[in-house]
Amino acid sequence: MKIKLYIPTCDKYNWLIQPFAYTFNKFWSEDIEVVYLGYTNPNFELPNNFKFVSLGKNDSLENWSTDLRNYFNSINDEWLMMTVDDSMLTSRTDSKLYDLALDYLQKTDRKIGRFGLERDLVTREHQHWDTHKGFNLVEAKNEATHRISMRWSIWKREYLVKHFV
């Protein structure tokens, strides 16, 4: 399974695209398609695996989640990866673990809306979820903080869309 990485941004932070692209391609892969979702196209060239999609007129913050929901309703991706625009990679990504996550999502019959790619969950209240090829997977308990986060996660598109208000 090959999925795209989507990164919502705003005009004020378009300048972050260049350093993000550099660190992403250095520490992960130029084979992953990265799609920035913003408003005004940046005035610099993007690497071949990066593209910018304008969500329309940059009118108000109140419309931001509506613009994202409308965009994600317009695509057919079953799964997508998402992070925030200021979450740059600082070291090599373990591609084998990422591939294991994709393999699990393809093979499991369990309902999953969001699969976190960061290790932060183990510092909050969690419980064992499943084991896949020798790796333990955990889920946040209902009382845990930040059960939904846009940082480095794989989302089932339908699940993501229903959480935009």
Predicted regions and their residues:
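N-proximal low-complexity "stem/linker" segments adjacent to membrane-targeting elements
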Residues: M1-P19
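Short, acidic, metal-binding catalytic loop of nucleotide-sugar glycosyltransferases
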Residues: Y22-I32
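Active-site-proximal specificity loops/subdomain of glycosyltransferases
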Residues: Y36-M81, R92-T93
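Short, flexible, basic/aromatic active-site loop/helix in glycosyltransferases
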Residues: H128-T145
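The conserved acidic donor/metal-binding loop of glycosyltransferases
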Residues: D86-M88
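Conserved donor-nucleotide/metal-binding helix-loop-beta segment in metal-dependent transferases, i.e.
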Residues: S91-R124
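Short, charged/polar "capping" segments at the starts of alpha-helices
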Residues: Y13-I17, N41-P47, R124-E125
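Conserved nucleotide-sugar donor-binding
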Residues: D77, I148-F164
